[in-house]
Amino acid sequence: MSGADRPDRIARRIHVKGKVQGVWFRAWTVEQAAELGLDGWVRNRADGSVEAVAAGPADRVEEMIARCRRGSPASRVDSIDVEDTPGVVAQGFTQKPTV
């Protein structure tokens, strides 16, 4: 387990709205997180948005947020909300079921 409360790590919840479902956004997010060495998860939401939690070194999490703002090649990001996520985030980065 990876604690976001460690001084060298942060965790952020990222909520992305726009054309982000049916355009490989989740798979792309998993690829980006793996490239950056982040822990967390991503899932579709019933309202058509995508939600993710990313945890790791601050500079890498901030880079993930920047990449989510740009979006995957086929997506269109209209807005993004980011907030701190306290607690423990499991190791690895996975896709979760839609909620």
Curated annotation (Swiss-Prot):
Catalytic activity: an acyl phosphate + H2O = a carboxylate + phosphate + H(+)
Hydrolase in keyword set: yes
InterPro entries documented for this protein: Acylphosphatase, Acylphosphatase-like_dom, Acylphosphatase-like_dom_sf, Acylphosphatase_CS
Enzyme class: hydrolase
EC number: 3.6.1.7
Gene Ontology molecular functions: acylphosphatase activity
PROSITE patterns according to UniProt: ACYLPHOSPHATASE_1, ACYLPHOSPHATASE_2, ACYLPHOSPHATASE_3
Pfam families listed in its UniProt record: Acylphosphatase
Keyword NADP: no
Catalytic center residues: R26, N44
Keywords: Hydrolase
Residue ranges of every copy of the Acylphosphatase-like domain listed in the record: 11-97
Family: Belongs to the acylphosphatase family.
Protein's UniProt name: Acylphosphatase
Provenance organism: Rhizorhabdus wittichii (strain DSM 6014 / CCUG 31198 / JCM 15750 / NBRC 105917 / EY 4224 / RW1) (Sphingomonas wittichii)
Native organism taxonomy: Bacteria, Pseudomonadati, Pseudomonadota, Alphaproteobacteria, Sphingomonadales
